[in-house]
Amino acid sequence: MNMKEISKVVDLVRESNPLVHNITNVVVTNFTANGLLALGASPVMAYAKEEVAEMASIAGALVLNMGTLRPEEVEAMLLAGKSANKNDVPVLFDPVGAGATSYRTEVARYIPAEIDLAVIRGNAAEIANVINEKWEIKGVDAGTGNGNVVNIAKQAADELNTVAVITGQEDVVTDGERTILIRNGHPILTKVTGTGCLLTSVIGAFVAVEKDYVKAAVAALTFYGVAAEIAASKTVENGPGSFQIEFLNQLANTTSDDIEKYGKIEVIQ
């Protein structure tokens, strides 16, 4: 896996304009839709249990995000996820805040038990709690703590039979056998709500067009991080509001050549 072939996946996304079905949270819906549109994907936000199975069946990817968790959304996620599995549509899961409350943790463990996942994406604390490993968490945005992030990612990939993505200062992508670190991004991403949730949906767009899900995830993370770096270089002195707008611009403007030039990945296994 080299930077040139990784960089070409973004071109494939823009050529294919994949439909990404998001069952996401109320905080990030608008930002997620605009981010996917800027990238070149086609977002749809369909939540009603009466239509989610049908919508998921025709999507390029299904993204399940439990940020603002309610029983109605859990039911919709299960219906959509099982339909996606039946129709060979890749499912991505963002277990937002797993470990913060008993209900949230229960749902975060139940969904992977019921639905086959192509990718699970979260911070270290969230992924650790999904697989019942101890890790500190406070609220839904905690990701720091003590532990080996690569080992947690590999364990999650093995136990859930999926590609595990753990994001933080360094991002980890693994299927349990291949493990890659991505070192792109900028700290100001943490000052804009929804950047992690949007990232999961962006990975969904890449997974929709690249069936090697490790490669797709690495490409998405590298693209996202490079776009953030470029946006920050133009706006960081102005603050997160200016960054958010410029970041959407860079999701549209960052090219495969930019990824080749600025991408920072390391294959560690």
From Swiss-Prot:
Pathway it works in: Cofactor biosynthesis; thiamine diphosphate biosynthesis; 4-methyl-5-(2-phosphoethyl)-thiazole from 5-(2-hydroxyethyl)-4-methylthiazole: step 1/1
Record-level GO BP terms: thiamine biosynthetic process; thiamine diphosphate biosynthetic process
Cofactor: Mg(2+)
MF annotations from Gene Ontology: ATP binding; hydroxyethylthiazole kinase activity; magnesium ion binding
Keyword terms of this UniProt record: ATP-binding, Kinase, Magnesium, Metal-binding, Nucleotide-binding, Thiamine biosynthesis, Transferase
Record keyword Membrane present: no
Residues given in the record as ATP binding sites: R121, T167
CDD domains noted in UniProt: THZ_kinase
Residues reported to bind substrate: M45, G194
Pfam families reported in the protein's UniProt record: HK
EC number per UniProt: 2.7.1.50
Catalytic activity as recorded in UniProt: 5-(2-hydroxyethyl)-4-methylthiazole + ATP = 4-methyl-5-(2-phosphooxyethyl)-thiazole + ADP + H(+)
The family this protein is said to belong to: Belongs to the Thz kinase family.
Its job: Catalyzes the phosphorylation of the hydroxyl group of 4-methyl-5-beta-hydroxyethylthiazole (THZ).
The protein's name in its UniProt record: Hydroxyethylthiazole kinase
Organism: Bacillus mycoides (strain KBAB4) (Bacillus weihenstephanensis)
Source organism phylogeny: Bacteria, Bacillati, Bacillota, Bacilli, Bacillales
